[in-house]
Structure formats: structure tokens, C-alpha cells
Design a protein with these regions (language model features):
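Polyanion-binding surfaces on beta-sheet-dominated domains and ring/shell assemblies
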Residues: 1-228
Length: 228
């Protein structure tokens, strides 16, 4: 980024303004959620746009063996794929530190909030449970991927339906889905705040993220309770 642009962004922040005209604690107003965008390849899916930032999330379900310390609970697994298609900052190859961190932030928001009742994912205690797999794919990174991925993951979970499962054979019929939804007790929403030279901003752009001194993502429940 050219030095003159950097100086301009920092000067605006010092004055309580930003490049796109927002106040420091003002979220982008153009937020949209689209459900069921990939009904043939995922049990649940969604697309989220926050400004020009776009993320697609999909939910797949599989059968697994429960962990020894939680024999009556299912599990979730969250992953994020950051490709050059979304930003020239990303590269093909093994998961980067950024993608691992992104997945962990979303995972913690869901897990620590208590939004999912994992006992309702149990098929046979100690032997067989459902595993919910959430994959997130940023399509365009215009800043604040954390919040966009979190919202996309939640939307995909809300859209998901269990596939047919034969307990006798232990086989899943992915071509036929039940009307049963994933048990969600609440809907945690994540908000990310950046500290830049002593000022705090929400919903940062890519350019603003380059100047961060610290970043904090907080998950809230519907009643305003901080849960993660």
C-alpha cells in the first residue's frame, strides 16, 4: 500500500472517520444472508455478504465415535479455506496460520456459547454420534472475514437438515434428507473490534486491518450475553 494512502487512512481514523464515510464504531449497512445455496452437495449452506466481503459456508454430517469423556455427545469440526480467488494475500497449499485461526474463532463462538446441544447428536451412547462438519469458503475478502465467516457458519447450521440414516446398516443416505434440523439453542453473533493507534473500530476493511495493534472478536447471544 502506498505511503500516502496509509497516512490518509490513519489521519481519518484519528479524526473519527473512515475511508468509506463510516464512523469508527459503525458497521457496514449492506449485510445479506442467503440460505440453501448448495442443496445438492451439503446438508446446509449459506452465503453471507458484508459490503463486498463474501463468504460461502457448507454443513456436512457424518457418523463418528464419541470421545471417551463425552460418550453421549456429538461433535463439530470447523475449517476455513483461504484461496487466492478471495484475495491475493492468500496462497494455495496447506492450511495457513490465518485460516486455522479463523476456523478456531468461529468454532469457539459456537462451542462456548452453548448454542448447540451436543447430546441431541447422540445416536447410541458410547458408540455412535453425529459429527457436524462446517466448511467456510471466502469468495472475496474486503475486510472482516471473522464476522462474515461466523455469520455464514451460523446460517448454514440453521439451514441444515439431517440426512436419512439406517441404524441397522450404519449407512447414511445423503440423497434423502429428513425434516429434522440441527438442534440450536441460541444464535451467537460475533463482532470483531480492532485497536489502531489508540482508537477502536468495528467491521474493518482490508486496508484498516493492515494497521491493527490488537484485535478482539466477541460472541453475543440474543439477549446480549457475552459468551465467547
Amino acid at each position: 500500500m502506498a505511503k500516502i494512502i496509509k497516512e490518509h487512512i490513519l489521519q481519518l481514523i484519528e479524526k473519527g472517520k473512515r475511508q468509506d464515510g463510516r464512523d469508527l464504531l459503525e458497521y457496514r449497512s449492506d449485510v445479506s444472508v442467503e440460505y440453501g445455496i448448495s442443496p445438492k452437495t451439503a446438508e446446509g449452506s449459506a452465503r453471507v455478504r458484508i459490503g463486498e466481503t463474501e463468504v460461502v459456508a457448507g454443513v456436512k454430517m457424518d457418523i463418528s465415535t464419541p470421545y471417551p469423556d463425552s460418550p453421549n455427545q456429538g461433535s463439530i469440526m470447523v475449517g476455513a479455506e483461504l484461496s487466492p480467488f478471495a484475495s491475493d494475500r492468500f496462497e494455495m497449499g496447506p492450511p495457513s496460520i490465518e485460516s486455522i485461526e479463523l476456523a478456531r474463532v468461529v468454532d469457539r463462538g459456537i462451542r462456548e456459547s452453548g448454542a448447540m446441544d451436543f447430546t441431541k447428536l447422540c445416536i447410541k451412547e458410547g458408540e455412535m454420534v453425529w459429527q457436524v462438519i462446517i466448511d467456510m469458503y471466502p469468495m472475496n475478502d474486503a475486510g472482516n472475514l471473522r464476522d462474515a465467516c461466523s455469520l455464514a457458519a451460523l446460517a448454514a447450521l440453521k439451514d441444515a437438515k439431517f440426512p436419512e440414516f439406517d441404524k441397522k446398516t450404519g449407512k447414511i443416505d445423503y440423497y434423502n434428507r429428513t425434516k429434522k434440523s440441527i438442534p440450536l439453542e441460541d444464535e451467537p453473533i460475533e463482532v470483531t473490534v480492532l485497536k489502531i493507534h489508540g482508537d477502536y473500530i468495528v467491521d474493518p476493511s482490508c486496508e484498516e486491518e493492515e494497521f491493527l495493534d490488537a484485535r478482539l472478536t466477541v460472541a453475543f447471544l440474543k439477549d446480549g450475553t457475552i459468551c465467547a
